[in-house]
Amino acid sequence: MSIDRYHQQFTVSWDQLHRDVRALCHQLVERDFQGIVAITRGGLIPAALIARELNVRLVDTVCIKSYEHQDQGGLQVMKGIDHDGAGWLLVDDLVDTGNTARAVREMLPEAHFVTVYAKPEGRPLVDQYLTEVAQDCWIQFPWDMGVAYVEPLVDQVRSRDS
């Protein structure tokens, strides 16, 4: 899938991510999890934040590569896991088309699967999510961005007009 499928952009700041993860944790706080499995790389930071909020000390990873920048390609399992997920919380930043989610569900069919953000195509594959975003929306996560100087608007307009 190419960048052409994205017509909107949603930028998530660090503050927004913390608020969203904490809100998701409010839905999970009554449950008792043996551990957390983060889907790398996108699920690492949400999993760390969730582990802190739920006081879960055991965190593992399943490593699947599915994106090259904004192009979604075939799945490559780089590290699997040796249990069915019973009693475990499975965490990713988002579910998009569901390709990664399907593969991980096969590996960990008994895990409780949560994502912070969900798109319509992948939403049925997770047990819980916090925020739904449009299928054609590219989500910019804070770990993918840097701070850069932006020229004042008046200077941008003047340089464009000259």
UniProtKB/Swiss-Prot annotation:
* Top-level EC class as recorded in UniProt: transferase
Q: Name one GO molecular function term.
A: guanine phosphoribosyltransferase activity
Please list the cofactors this protein needs. Answer: Mg(2+)
Query: In which residues is guanine bound?
Result: D96, I139
Q: Where does it primarily localize?
A: membrane
Gene3D superfamilies named in the record: 3.40.50.2020
Q: Which reaction does it catalyse?
A: GMP + diphosphate = guanine + 5-phospho-alpha-D-ribose 1-diphosphate; XMP + diphosphate = xanthine + 5-phospho-alpha-D-ribose 1-diphosphate; IMP + diphosphate = hypoxanthine + 5-phospho-alpha-D-ribose 1-diphosphate
Residues bound to 5-phospho-alpha-D-ribose 1-diphosphate are R41, G42, D92, D93, L94, V95, D96, T97, G98, N99, T100
Q: Which residues does xanthine bind?
A: D96, I139
Pathway note: Purine metabolism; GMP biosynthesis via salvage pathway; GMP from guanine: step 1/1; Purine metabolism; XMP biosynthesis via salvage pathway; XMP from xanthine: step 1/1
Q: Which residues bind GMP?
A: D96, T97, G98, N99, T100, W138, I139
Q: Where in the cell is it found?
A: Cell inner membrane
GO terms of biological process kind: GMP salvage; purine ribonucleoside salvage; XMP salvage
* Gene Ontology CC entries for this record: plasma membrane
The entry's Mg(2+)-binding residues are D93
Q: Which InterPro entries match?
A: PRibTrfase_dom (IPR000836), PRTase-like (IPR029057), Xanthine_Guanine_PRibTrfase (IPR023747)
Q: Which keywords label this protein?
A: Cell inner membrane, Cell membrane, Glycosyltransferase, Magnesium, Membrane, Metal-binding, Purine salvage, Transferase
| Annotated EC | 2.4.2.-, 2.4.2.22
Q: How does it sit in the membrane?
A: Peripheral membrane protein
Subunit notes for this chain? Homotetramer.
Instruction: State the HAMAP family in the record.
Output: XGPRT
What family is it from? Belongs to the purine/pyrimidine phosphoribosyltransferase family. XGPT subfamily.
According to UniProt, the name of this protein is Xanthine-guanine phosphoribosyltransferase
